């Protein structure tokens, strides 16, 4: 933590413990240093939640300076490439002194937005854990029966995971037979039980030798398969929590009325933008999502545009995935996508076009608090 005066001289610099009482004491102490005090932070994650909450309780506005901007600005300060918390704090304080009017003011989110942000991040972690577990499961399955690993659609078909949680060795699968495996999988609720059982037995019949370490590998396969099943249950429960909270938001029906956006993408959207009332325009939303090209002019070279590098890594996938879904299920989006393809654009470029267009539509729906209708009047294209 660092405090500078209006000339840039350091008035106070110390390490701050992330506890409520020291934070309150520090706020009171700094308020005595000057009539007007400006606070700026470079963190908005849970690590700064206590500080931001304490400052909000004290009716103190807080500005935000991104960590990237701090890193870039620190190069011109004394110390060169050295990086310490004390130096970063001084850079933040001095940049706030000089450029405070250009820095955005943080607005505290309500509990619903905070809960959605936590739950969506938790679901992302669970999905990543599931992917890692399936990859490890495939690796172990090769040590038991490579033919079985080749035919097992572990990612797209849950029935294979159910099968491997009970049967892993080729001999056990052959001895059980198609009919028995079909009954076991059918009782477990697997829809295509017969096709999975037939493919598994066919693959098991191609291998009669026992591979080294098969017993341990089979045990690990069963353990990993059970782990995938447990993760699936946790993801389902998390989805229910996300949907329940998302439906409580007053704009839930408005957001999900746009084709291609369900409760999961809608929750991700709210988690990324916070309060939708802060969105100033469709252009701002597009720039926030990294869908608006930025100029790259220099001297006589004008009119050059390039892809932005600074944008919300949470918001862009929401708009892109919603456009990708709408292209498949909405005739208007499909026609617009196809027109861009006919112009010679590649698939990703053609998908970004409806994603950019959807920012205009979504902003207008949120602004007017109305749901999307197929026969709604067209919304004017934005300049960006």
What are these regions (language model features)?
Residues 1-384:
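A detector of single, family-specific signature residues
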């Amino acid at each position: 933590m660092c405090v500078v005066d209006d000339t840039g001289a350091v008035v106070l610099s110390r390490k701050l413990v992330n506890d409520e009482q020291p934070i309150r004491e520090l706020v009171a102490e700094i308020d005595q240093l000057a009539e007007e005090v400006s606070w700026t932070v470079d963190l908005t994650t849970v690590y700064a939640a206590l500080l931001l909450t304490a400052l909000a309780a004290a009716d103190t506005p807080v500005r935000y300076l991104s960590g990237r901007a701090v890193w870039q600005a620190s190069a011109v300060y004394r110390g060169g490439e050295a990086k310490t918390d004390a130096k970063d704090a001084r850079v933040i304080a001095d940049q706030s002194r000089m450029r405070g009017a250009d820095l955005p003011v943080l607005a505290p989110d309500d509990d619903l937005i905070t809960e959605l942000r936590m739950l969506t991040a938790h679901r992302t972690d669970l999905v990543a854990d599931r992917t890692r577990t399936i990859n490890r499961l495939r690796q172990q399955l090769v040590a038991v029966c490579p033919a079985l690993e080749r035919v097992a659609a572990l990612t797209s078909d849950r029935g294979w995971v159910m099968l491997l949680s009970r049967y892993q060795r080729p001999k056990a699968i052959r001895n059980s037979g198609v009919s028995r495996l079909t009954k076991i999988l059918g009782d477990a609720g697997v829809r295509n039980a017969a096709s999975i059982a037939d493919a598994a037995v066919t693959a098991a019949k191609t291998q009669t030798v026992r591979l080294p370490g098969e017993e341990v590998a089979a045990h690990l396969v069963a353990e990993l398969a059970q782990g995938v099943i447990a993760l699936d249950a946790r993801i389902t429960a998390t989805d229910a929590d996300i949907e329940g909270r998302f439906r409580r938001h007053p704009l839930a029906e408005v957001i999900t009325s746009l084709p291609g956006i369900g409760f999961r993408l809608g929750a991700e959207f709210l988690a990324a933008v916070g309060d939708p009332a802060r969105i100033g325009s469709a252009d701002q939303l597009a720039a926030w999502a990294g869908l608006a090209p930025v100029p790259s002019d220099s001297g006589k070279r004008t009119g050059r545009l390039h892809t932005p590098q600074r944008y919300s890594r949470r918001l862009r996938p929401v708009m892109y995935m919603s456009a990708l879904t709408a292209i498949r299920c909405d005739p208007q989006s499909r026609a617009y996508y196809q027109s861009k393809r006919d112009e010679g654009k590649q698939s990703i470029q053609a998908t970004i076009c409806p994603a950019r267009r959807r920012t205009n539509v979504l902003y207008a729906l949120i602004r007017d608090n109305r749901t999307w209708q197929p026969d709604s009047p067209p919304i004017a294209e934005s300049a960006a």
